[in-house]
Amino acid sequence: MLAVHFGAGNIGRGFIGQLLQKAGYEIAFVDVNAALVDELNERKMYRVQLATTGKPESVVEGVRAINGQDVAAVAEAIATADLVTTAVGPNILPHIAGAIAAGITQRLTVHARPLNVIACENMIGGSEKLKEHVYEHLTESVQAQAAQWIGFPNAAVDRIVPLQQHADKLLVMVEPFFEWVVDSSQIVGEVPAIEGVTYVEDLAPYIERKLFTVNTGHAVIAYLGYQLGMKTIDEAMRDDRIVQATRGALQETGALLAAKYGFDPQVHGQYVEKILGRYTNPLLSDDIVRVARSPIRKLSQHDRLVGPALQCMEKGMNASYLGLAIAAALAFDYPEDAESARIQASLKEFGWENTLHNCTGIPAGHPLEEIVREQARRLKEWSGSH
């Protein structure tokens, strides 16, 4: 069995690649980093280390790599593949769509058989979005065939892979915890047998649970930690105020998730505590500025902070701690981040209210606006005291 995986970075190798290899797939990584591609082709294996006591290691073998610039070679691999996966980042999906389309076209011309393309990205509806991009490169007749033979099942993925540097360029350290949930209703043909993958009929609750817990929590810590002059996530989690605010925000999102999807509050509470424990693991330590980057995307109306805050307000629930995190994200002043620079320029030119409305989609006069304003005042007291 062959799996073609786009993105030979730490997530690709340390998470998706490892699970695919354990499931018996030969893996062809696709990446534009020529040095990484050469290294993988030379060694045909790499090591994965767990970020826990003793740092236990496993070896992933039977791998090769294709340079993403070589569209013909990528298309040829997809034409014979049993599965295609991605872990490239939401912004890169449009750039790999052409090669995937070429592979699908070649495949359907030679022999029509089912193929599933799973985007393992930190976004809602990643595979669906990738499908839209891919279909832009397909002729109408191939689109009609693809609708029958090619599945794009959405997925929710979760595994922290910290920033790291090793003498061995291919070695990757990952946390022991992981979650990979796939929407089985969108699969074409047989469901791939991959140990560690959870297949569900309705992915929405799992995507939102992850986004509104892991990503929300990470964002709260990063934006508040930055205001207090901290450098890493685990350092920030040694500050009681940040722990309280993070737990508070996750209680707000937890109440929302229980109301929307019927998650058992006790079971969800245990999940939250597990997530909080991940943030305090020094081996998983991440740079605050990396986690906080792209604040405009993270402040958008349906993302990790504003999304749950607006929904909490609609249900008459509390969103004070989420409001505090939104205020901190607006105050994230890191000139090297283009989105941060745009927010700060907007604050100077158009003022706080207009910037809030434009960045978040929170309507003028919405009760959440007043909460964020109040929390912004509180934030000034916080940052003035460190």
Swiss-Prot record:
A biological process from GO: mannitol catabolic process
PROSITE patterns from the UniProt entry: MANNITOL_DHGENASE
Keywords of the record: NAD, Oxidoreductase
Principal EC category: oxidoreductase
Binding positions (NAD(+)): A3, V4, H5, F6, G7, A8, G9, N10, I11, G12, R13, G14
Source domain of life: Bacteria
Pfam families found in the cross-reference section: Mannitol_dh, Mannitol_dh_C
Catalysed conversion reaction: D-mannitol 1-phosphate + NAD(+) = beta-D-fructose 6-phosphate + NADH + H(+)
GO cellular component: cytosol
Disulfide bonds: none
HAMAP family reported for this sequence: Mannitol_dehydrog (MF_00196)
Name of the protein: Mannitol-1-phosphate 5-dehydrogenase
Source species: Brevibacillus brevis (strain 47 / JCM 6285 / NBRC 100599)
